C-alpha cells in the first residue's frame, strides 16, 4: 500500500495525531507567514507502504503529550496584533488561508480554542514544541507499530494531485483488507460538516470477536496513569469525529466535487508516471485525478464495510513501553454534532474565539501562550474589577 512521507513536502493535515495528548501537526496552510500556491508543481518523494502478510499500512503521524513549556518571550507579544484575532472582514478560514480543517486542530480547539488560534499565529513556537523529547518518543512508538505490518517504498510525486492520489490509493488498498477481516492502520477519512471540509487519519480499524468494527486510537503518555477527565473529553471527541467521517464515507455522503472545490485540486490533472505505476500494481486503473477520486468513492460506498460499532482509546506508557489501559469511548451523535457545530462557528466567522472557563484556568499554567493570551488578560481584568466592586460594598 502507498503512504505519504514528508520528505521535501509540507506537513499535511491528513497526517493527524494519533498517539499523544493535545498537540497538532501544522496543516498544509501551517503558517500565515509563508504559503504555498494553491495550485502548483511539487517535486519530491512520497512513499509506498507494502504491507506484510497480516495487515495493512499507514501514514506517519506525530504525537501529542504536552506538559509545561517554556514561556513565550515578551518580544513575541509585540508581533501579535489585536487585529490578528479580531479582524472581521474575513472569516478565520479565509484569514488563515485554510481550505480544510484537520481533526487534530479541532481537538486542540476542544482543549482550548485560544491556544489553537495562537498555534496558527505563532507557527514557529508550535514547531519548537513538536521537537520535545516526549513528542519524539511518541512518534517512535507509533512508527514501530506501523513497521510491524508494512514496508515503505518511495514514490515520485510531481503535483499536489499526485500527493493526494497516494493517500487515496492507500484507502483503496486497505478497504479489501478490512473487508477480509484484517487489521488496518492509518486509514484516511474526510467529509464536509457544516460546509467545512474536515480531514483525519484513523489510527487502527479491526473486527473484534463479536464481529463489530472497532476503531482503536493509540495515545502515549509520560505518566503511567490514565488521563484527566479534561483530556479524556478531548480524546472521546476525536474518535467520535473519526466515526462521523468514516460512516459518512461508507454511506456515500461524500461527492467528488467536495474534494475538488474545497481543496482546490485539479480534477483533470494527469497523474504522474510513478503514481500511475503504483496504482496499476494495486489493480487500479486511473489516468487523471478525477478518475481516481471516482474509483475511491464508488469503492468505499459500495463496499461491505459497516459503520464503526465501537470506539476505544488505548493508553501506552512511554517509560515502561507497556500498556496503561484501554478506554471504551461513548458515542452520542447529537452531542458530537452539536459540539462540532459550535467549534466550526468560529472558523466560519460567526463568533470570536474563546478561551477556557474559569473552572479550567489550570490549563493556562502549561500553555505556551500564557503571557500573551488576550482571553486570559481580559478574564483577570474582569475578576479584578468584580473583586474591587465587591470590596467597595463591604
UniProtKB/Swiss-Prot annotation:
Entry keyword annotation includes Ubl conjugation: no
Cofactor, free-text remark: Binds 1 [4Fe-4S] cluster.
InterPro entries: EXOV (IPR019190), PDDEXK-like_dom_sf (IPR011604)
Subcellular location(s) per record: Nucleus; Cytoplasm, Cytosol
Alphabetized Gene3D superfamilies for the sequence: 3.90.320.10
Ligand binding ([4Fe-4S] cluster): 112, 364, 367, 373
Disulfide links within the chain: none
E.C. number(s) listed in UniProt: 3.1.-.-
Enzyme class at the top of the EC tree: hydrolase
UniProt main location, coarse: nucleus
Keyword set, alphabetical order: 4Fe-4S, Cytoplasm, DNA damage, DNA repair, DNA-binding, Exonuclease, Hydrolase, Iron, Iron-sulfur, Magnesium, Metal-binding, Nuclease, Nucleus
GO molecular function terms listed in the Swiss-Prot or TrEMBL record: 4 iron, 4 sulfur cluster binding; DNA binding; metal ion binding; single-stranded DNA 5'-3' DNA exonuclease activity
A single GO cellular-component term on record: nucleus
GO biological process, alphabetically ordered: interstrand cross-link repair
Lineage: superkingdom: Eukaryota
Cofactor(s) annotated in UniProt: [4Fe-4S] cluster; Mg(2+)
Region feature (Disordered): 42-79
Family: Belongs to the EXO5 family.
Entry-linked PANTHER family: EXONUCLEASE V
Function: Single-stranded DNA (ssDNA) bidirectional exonuclease involved in DNA repair. Probably involved in DNA repair following ultraviolet (UV) irradiation and interstrand cross-links (ICLs) damage. Has both 5'-3' and 3'-5' exonuclease activities with a strong preference for 5'-ends.
Protein name, per record: Exonuclease V
Upper classification of the organism: Eukaryota, Metazoa, Chordata, Craniata, Vertebrata
Gene designation per UniProt: exo5
Amino acid at each position: 500500500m502507498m503512504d505519504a512521507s514528508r520528505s521535501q513536502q509540507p506537513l499535511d493535515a491528513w497526517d493527524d495525531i494519533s498517539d499523544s495528548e493535545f498537540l497538532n501537526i501544522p496543516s498544509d496552510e501551517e503558517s500565515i507567514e509563508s504559503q504555498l500556491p494553491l495550485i502548483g508543481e511539487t517535486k519530491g518523494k512520497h512513499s509506498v507502504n507494502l504491507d506484510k502478510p497480516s495487515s495493512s499500512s499507514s501514514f506517519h503521524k506525530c504525537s501529542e503529550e504536552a506538559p509545561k513549556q517554556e514561556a513565550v518571550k515578551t518580544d513575541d507579544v509585540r508581533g501579535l496584533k489585536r487585529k490578528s484575532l479580531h479582524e472581521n472582514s474575513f472569516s478565520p478560514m479565509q484569514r488563515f488561508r485554510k481550505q480544510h480543517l484537520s481533526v487534530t486542530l479541532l481537538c486542540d480547539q476542544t482543549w482550548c480554542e485560544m491556544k489553537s488560534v495562537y498555534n496558527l499565529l505563532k507557527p514557529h513556537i508550535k514547531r519548537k514544541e513538536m521537537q520535545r523529547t516526549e513528542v519524539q518518543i511518541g512518534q517512535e512508538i507509533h512508527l514501530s507499530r506501523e513497521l510491524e505490518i508494512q514496508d515503505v517504498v518511495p514514490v515520485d510525486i510531481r503535483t499536489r494531485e499526485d500527493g493526494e492520489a497516494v493517500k487515496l490509493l492507500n484507502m483503496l488498498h486497505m478497504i479489501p483488507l478490512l473487508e477480509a477481516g484484517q487489521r488496518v492502520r492509518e486509514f484516511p477519512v474526510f467529509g464536509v460538516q457544516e460546509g467545512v471540509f474536515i480531514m483525519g487519519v484513523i489510527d487502527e480499524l479491526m473486527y473484534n470477536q463479536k464481529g463489530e468494527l472497532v476503531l482503536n486510537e493509540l495515545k502515549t503518555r509520560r505518566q503511567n496513569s490514565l488521563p484527566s477527565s479534561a483530556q479524556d473529553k478531548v480524546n472521546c471527541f476525536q474518535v467520535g469525529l473519526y466515526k462521523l467521517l468514516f460512516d459518512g464515507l461508507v454511506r456515500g455522503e461524500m461527492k467528488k466535487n467536495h474534494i475538488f472545490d474545497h481543496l482546490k485540486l485539479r480534477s483533470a490533472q494527469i497523474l504522474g508516471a510513478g503514481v500511475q505505476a503504483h496504482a496499476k500494481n494495486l489493480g487500479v486503473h486511473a489516468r487523471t485525478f478525477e478518475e481516481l477520486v471516482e474509483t475511491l468513492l464508488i469503492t468505499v460506498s459500495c463496499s461491505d464495510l459497516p459503520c464503526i460499532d465501537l470506539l476505544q482509546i488505548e493508553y501506552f506508557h512511554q517509560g515502561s513501553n507497556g500498556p496503561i489501559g484501554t478506554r471504551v469511548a461513548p458515542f452520542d451523535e447529537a452531542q458530537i454534532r452539536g459540539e462540532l457545530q459550535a467549534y466550526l462557528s468560529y472558523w466560519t466567522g460567526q463568533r470570536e474565539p474563546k478561551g477556557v472557563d474559569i473552572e479550567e484556568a489550570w490549563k493556562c499554567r502549561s500553555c505556551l501562550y500564557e503571557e500573551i493570551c488576550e482571553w486570559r488578560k481580559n478574564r483577570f481584568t474582569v475578576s479584578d474589577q468584580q473583586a474591587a466592586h465587591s470590596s467597595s460594598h463591604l
